């Protein structure tokens, strides 16, 4: 299901101390799962930091709820995601407000929760600069073609006298993007002993077949005198459709 992405990581150090953090904090969108939106399976006050892979509501939509419930740490994103996040969260708020009104239910979070959430955002460069979040944890982001601002997240856990633990979170991954050059993951990263946490929503999708089918359907519709209506349900999709239609027009 494309919904509610939120990975809790608990690091247990040899001295008995712990670090708790999450990667993404998404909204459950399907009605069958909406009952899970109101709470977390952890105490938000105990989460030291959050890292965001990309700016889609199923990965960011509950960030204001996290803050509302007591989270006080940093929210690490790429620079592009930091720019787009206010728009995405404002849209999420409006949608949730309408849903709550229709169902005569309590709203998940307020506009002030959204504003407070944005004050926690810390924008990070891709791969040129790692962030030492604390003495034991280093964060590095790498470009991901899923959407502008999307990132592969490398978390390295370090403790003196012990080998590093390297966690790679892919988010929704794509190795290409029509608006941006996506470099291959560096050899220095690929040769690390990695634990990879991978999203697999589109893992069996052949994108070339989808593109060919789209072109064929659009052309057939136009030739028969019809009108093409394209539904674009998330950030990035709409821009890709417009670009594709312009390319077809030029050809």
Predicted regions and their residues:
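His/Asp/Glu-rich metal-coordinating catalytic cores
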Residues: 1-51, 56-60, 65-240, 246-249
């Amino acid at each position: 299901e494309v919904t509610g992405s939120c990975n809790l990581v608990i690091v247990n150090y040899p001295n008995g101390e712990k670090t708790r953090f999450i990667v993404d904090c998404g909204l459950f969108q399907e009605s069958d799962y909406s009952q899970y939106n109101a709470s977390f399976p952890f105490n938000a006050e105990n989460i030291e930091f959050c890292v965001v892979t990309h700016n889609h509501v199923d990965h960011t939509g509950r960030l204001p709820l996290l803050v509302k419930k007591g989270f006080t740490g940093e929210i690490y994103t790429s620079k592009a995601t930091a720019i787009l996040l206010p728009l995405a969260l404002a849209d999420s708020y409006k949608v949730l407000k309408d849903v709550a009104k229709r169902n005569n239910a309590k709203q998940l979070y307020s506009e002030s929760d959204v504003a407070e959430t944005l004050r926690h955002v810390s924008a990070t460069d891709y791969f040129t600069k790692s962030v030492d979040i604390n003495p034991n944890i280093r964060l590095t982001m790498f470009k991901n073609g899923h959407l502008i601002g999307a990132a592969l997240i490398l978390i390295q856990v370090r403790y003196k006298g012990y080998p590093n633990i390297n966690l790679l979170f892919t988010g929704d991954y794509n190795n290409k993007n029509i608006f941006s050059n996506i470099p291959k993951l560096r050899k220095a990263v690929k040769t690390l002993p990695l634990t990879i946490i991978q999203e697999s929503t589109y893992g069996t999708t052949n994108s070339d077949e989808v593109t060919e089918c789209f072109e064929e359907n659009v052309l057939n519709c136009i030739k028969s005198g019809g009108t093409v209506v394209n539904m674009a349900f998330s950030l990035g999709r709409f821009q890709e459709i417009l670009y594709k239609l312009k390319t077809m027009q030029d050809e």
